[in-house]
């Protein structure tokens, strides 16, 4: 008898491009399922941006509280920190408790913690409730992304993961507008928006099917299931992807965070103009995600281009003589970011089997939001060394260019290594 096949890694996305999805990918049921997953993935974005427009009013309300200058901004940022720290643990719970069950529970609890500032009068208690919002966001984001990996395969999976990026970019702009409009009636009013998750939870319970491991591998050989069942968690390959994701998230978020300060340094102080620039850059993220979905290139092939575009955008911002050129640089950067995010996510997903998917996506999600949390700290550190925020963009341009070159070299090396043919077992 021939020797048993060695453990097979999860196939890259292009290798299973023609494989059937685990779930039906047409009809009203498919569209409803996809809508629920995209809506769920937008809930953490709601937590990140909704209250930004009312922070000044919130500061005025708690002006008598010691430490208000630190606590009020923390109410905005602490959910992201909680998400970064707890998403890996949420991934472990996802694999053990079940994706659908945890998603439904987390979506309900999200509404309870999210609306808590409506009746809390202590600023410290509000910040604590915001931290708990981040805990539920970690579970929701991990569950939604993992379910996309469970329900779909190949390029369909890649397309819907990229769609997640598009929905996040669009929803961020929409939530800012909602928060600003609702905030005109009082700083507490925007927190009512968190109750929308109570509408999503019963729909998720009714219309999201219970995921199950796909059985494509069973067709390979009767010996494969036993071997794959003992397959260890892919720590080493996933660690490299997660480290690259932390760095990529810093490149992705820096200009979104620093844009208003850079424009202010050039004399642009009108909030309408700053908002217009932010909306244009958000549109570039959507365009980048669309570009990713419209081609058949693998994530490994896209990453050098994505990091190169981010680096080029930073370089233009660094050398920009006026706000228009600065905005063009930010658009180039965000175009690269729109390609980068789905590339990194699909790359991580391709390394994971069903049993490991929750834990792996939790690690990836934590890495991404850790990079988001670190980006302003990185800019502060670089600015203290090079003397200005604009010059720090030049340092990031150089680092992005180095990463792009290294990824391009790695892609060429992989392309030069022909895969060994798999010997078929005669029946």
What are these language model-derived features?
Residues 299-344:
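C-terminal transmembrane helical hairpin of 12-TM major facilitator-type secondary transporters
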Residues 54-85:
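Extracellular/periplasmic helix-loop-helix junction of adjacent transmembrane segments
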Residues 154, 163-209, 213:
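Helix-loop-helix hairpin linking two adjacent transmembrane segments in secondary transporters
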């Amino acid at each position: 008898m021939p020797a048993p096949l060695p453990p097979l890694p999860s196939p890259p996305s292009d290798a299973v491009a023609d494989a059937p999805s685990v779930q039906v990918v047409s009809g009203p049921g498919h569209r409803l399922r996809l809508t629920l997953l995209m809506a769920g993935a937008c809930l953490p974005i709601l937590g990140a941006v909704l209250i930004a427009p009312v922070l000044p009013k919130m500061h005025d309300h708690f002006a008598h509280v010691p430490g208000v200058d630190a606590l009020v901004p923390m109410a905005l940022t602490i959910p992201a920190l909680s998400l970064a720290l707890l998403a890996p643990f949420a991934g472990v719970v996802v694999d053990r408790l079940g994706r659908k069950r945890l998603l439904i529970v987390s979506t309900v609890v999200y509404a309870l913690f999210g609306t808590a500032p409506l009746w809390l009068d202590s600023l410290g208690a509000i910040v604590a409730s915001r931290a708990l919002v981040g805990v539920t966001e970690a579970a929701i984001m991990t569950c939604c992304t993992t379910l996309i990996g469970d329900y779909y395969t190949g390029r369909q999976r890649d397309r819907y993961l990229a769609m997640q990026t598009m929905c996040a970019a669009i929803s961020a702009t929409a939530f800012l507008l909602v928060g600003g409009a609702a905030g005109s009636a009082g700083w507490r009013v925007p927190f009512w928006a968190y109750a929308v998750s109570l509408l999503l939870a019963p729909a998720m319970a009714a219309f999201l099917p219970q995921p199950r491991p796909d059985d494509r591998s069973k067709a390979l050989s009767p010996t494969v299931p036993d071997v794959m069942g003992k397959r260890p968690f892919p720590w080493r390959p996933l660690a490299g992807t997660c480290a690259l994701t932390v760095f990529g998230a810093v490149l992705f978020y820096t200009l979104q965070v620093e844009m208003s300060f850079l424009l202010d340094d050039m004399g642009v102080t009108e909030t309408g103009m700053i908002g217009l620039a932010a909306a244009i850059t958000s549109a570039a993220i959507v365009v980048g995600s669309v570009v990713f979905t419209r081609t058949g290139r693998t994530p490994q092939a896209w990453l050098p281009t994505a990091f190169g575009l981010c680096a080029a955008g930073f370089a233009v911002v660094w050398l920009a003589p006026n706000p228009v050129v600065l905005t063009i640089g930010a658009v180039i950067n965000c175009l690269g970011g729109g390609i980068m995010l789905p590339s990194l996510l699909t790359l991580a997903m391709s390394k994971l089997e069903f049993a490991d998917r929750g834990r792996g996506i939790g690690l990836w999600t934590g890495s991404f939001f850790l990079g988001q949390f670190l980006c302003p700290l990185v800019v502060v550190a670089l600015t203290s060394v090079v003397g200005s925020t604009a010059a720090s963009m030049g340092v990031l341009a150089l680092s992005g260019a180095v990463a792009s070159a290294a990824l391009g070299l790695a892609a060429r090396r992989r392309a030069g290594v022909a895969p060994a043919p798999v010997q078929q077992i005669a029946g």
